[in-house]
Structure formats: C-alpha cells, structure tokens
Design a protein with these regions (language model features):
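Rossmann-like adenosine-cofactor binding region
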Residues: 179-250
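Adenosine-phosphate binding glycine-rich loop
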Residues: 225, 229-292
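Conserved S-adenosyl-L-methionine
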Residues: 149-154, 245-247
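Phosphate/diphosphate ligand-binding glycine-rich loop within oxidoreductases
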Residues: 2-124
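N-terminal Rossmann-fold NAD(P) dinucleotide-binding loop
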Residues: 140-141, 235
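NAD(P)-binding Rossmann-fold cofactor-contacting core
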Residues: 152-176
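Glycine-rich Rossmann-fold phosphate-binding loop(s) that bind the pyrophosphate
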Residues: 13, 136-137
Length: 292
C-alpha cells in the first residue's frame, strides 16, 4: 500500500520564518497526502551546530521520514549519515536526509539541482565563461557545482574564510577537471569582476539578520549578470542595486522552489509541481529568511 502520510522537518539556525513547512504541507495537500513538517531550530533548542548528529538520530528514532538540513549544518551532518548519493558526496554538503525502512540515513543534495533548474529557467542566455562566486558554504558549493554542470568555463570562489574557498575550488577541480575553479580574496575582487560575465551570490548578506551588500556597489557594472541564493526577501539590496545598473538578475526564489520540489519527491515518492511551488514562494515574497 502506498504511503500517504509523512513526518519531515528542517534542522538549522534561525529558521523560524522558513517557508519550507508551508511549501511541503501545501503541495502534499494538493496531492491528497498528509505531510507534517516540523522546524528543529538549534538556536531555540540551545544546542551548537555540532549537535546535528544527535538531532538526526533523534528524528530517526521518533519516526521521521526525512529531514531538510540548512545553515550551518549542511557540511557538519555528513559524518552522521550512513550513505551519501554521488552529488552530495561530490559537493561535500547535504540538504536532504531520507530514512529508509531499516533506519539508515541517506544524504542527498537538492540545492544543486534546484539552482541549476532556476538558472536555466531565469537566465537561459547568460554567458558562462568567467563567473565570480561570493560564498563557499553549503549553498555556495551547490551553486558552483550547478553552474559548472551547466557549462561554465571557470568559477572563481571568494569567501571570508580563505581556506574554505580554497577547499571548495579544490573539490570542484577534482570533479570537473583542473582549471575549472579558482579561489581569490575580497581585495582581488575589482580585477576578478572587471573581466567576469556574472556573479553568483551565496553568502547570508541580504537576509533580514544580515542586511546590506556583499561587495562594494562600485564593483558592479552593466556587463554582469547577478544570481542570488537568498530568497527572502526576493528583492535583496544586491539585486536592486544590480538591476538599477542594467544588470540581468535572478532572485533566489527559483532555487528555493526547485530544491524543495526535488526534496518533496525524495520524501514522498510523488512528482511535485515545481512551478506551482515557485508561485507559492513568490506569493510569500514579503518576508525575510535564509536560503535552505
């Protein structure tokens, strides 16, 4: 008998305003399924990010079918899973965990497929020869993997933690071939951006708790496209500034919707309507929260 009820959740920090519960529960309702989606906020629980393994085990023992994982646990969770799919392994980041009938936890990454689908839909003609990416965390790893999968020539990764940028560039080169990725520092951004085709922004800057621009506005120029990972608000200060200069832009709503749709498929085994889920996100565009 096909299962028709599901208990899932989201582990992360500061996730109170997350749209994930509404997205998954609403799509389940429309498909005649029952989905209960719980928020497991490490800040409210008073536990550190390193407790993610304990939380995953507790969710499994309590009968959860699966979990989404968001900042700052996407990389920390790896050590606590029984198995990774090839994409999660290549990325070194997990945003979806599925518990099988035997209680084994398998990690997936729907951020990369979500970003790729959104980019192909929203910036289909964008030149991809040279890309600068800001941010090398879990969402950044997925975005870089996605644009290289879409055919980007080279991605230069910039992160406040230089060693994290270097580590991501190394993993990307190992997966896609030498020379496809590089890493740089913020003080080298002027040179990197002067010859770039586009910017992928994958840091928390622009969210409610982290307002502002992730780079000096003077470094933007009309020849760039700008793709955002932050989805609440859909119109970040970066996108507004870039659009005013004449840049082509892509908000983070598509990545959020398409990654959620891919996670829904993993949780339920049913085919979601991703465009309908994107409309749900667009309809809730007024609030502010983190990329998931």
């Amino acid at each position: 008998v096909a299962k028709d009820s599901f208990l899932v959740g989201l582990i992360g920090s500061g996730i109170g305003p997350s749209l994930s519960p509404a997205l998954h529960e609403r799509e389940a309702d429309r498909q005649g399924l029952r989905c209960v989606y719980r928020l497991i906020d490490i800040d409210r629980l008073g536990v550190p990010p390193e407790a993610v393994g304990d939380l995953v085990r507790a969710a499994r023992d309590l009968g959860f079918d699966g979990l989404n994982i968001t900042h700052p646990c996407k990389q920390l969770v790896l050590a606590h899973l029984d198995e990774l799919d090839s994409q999660a392994e290549a990325l070194g980041a997990v945003n979806t965990v599925i518990f099988d009938g035997a209680g084994r936890a398998r990690g997936h990454n729907t951020d990369v497929t979500g970003f790729a689908a959104s980019f192909a839909r929203g910036l289909p003609d964008a030149p991809l020869e040279r890309i600068v990416q800001l941010g090398a965390g879990g969402a950044g790893a997925a975005a870089a993997h996605a644009v290289l999968t879409l055919g980007a020539g080279r991605v230069t990764v910039v992160d406040a933690l230089a060693e994290r940028a270097a580590a991501l560039a190394g993993r990307l080169n190992a997966h896609f071939g030498a020379g496809r990725a590089g890493h740089s520092t913020a003080d080298a951004l002027p040179g990197a951006l002067s010859g770039a085709d586009g910017i992928v922004h994958a840091t928390p800057t622009g969210m409610a708790a982290h307002p502002g621009l992730p780079l000096p506005a003077g470094l933007l120029h009309p020849g760039l496209w700008v793709a955002e990972v932050v989805y609440r608000p859909l119109e970040t200060e970066l996108l507004a500034t870039a659009r005013a200069l004449g840049c082509a832009t892509l908000d983070g709503g598509g990545m959020a919707a398409f990654q959620a749709a891919d996670a829904f498929r993993l949780f339920t085994g049913r085919e979601p309507d991703a465009v309908r889920m994107l409309a749900d996100i667009t309809g809730a565009a007024g609030a502010v929260a983190a990329p998931e």
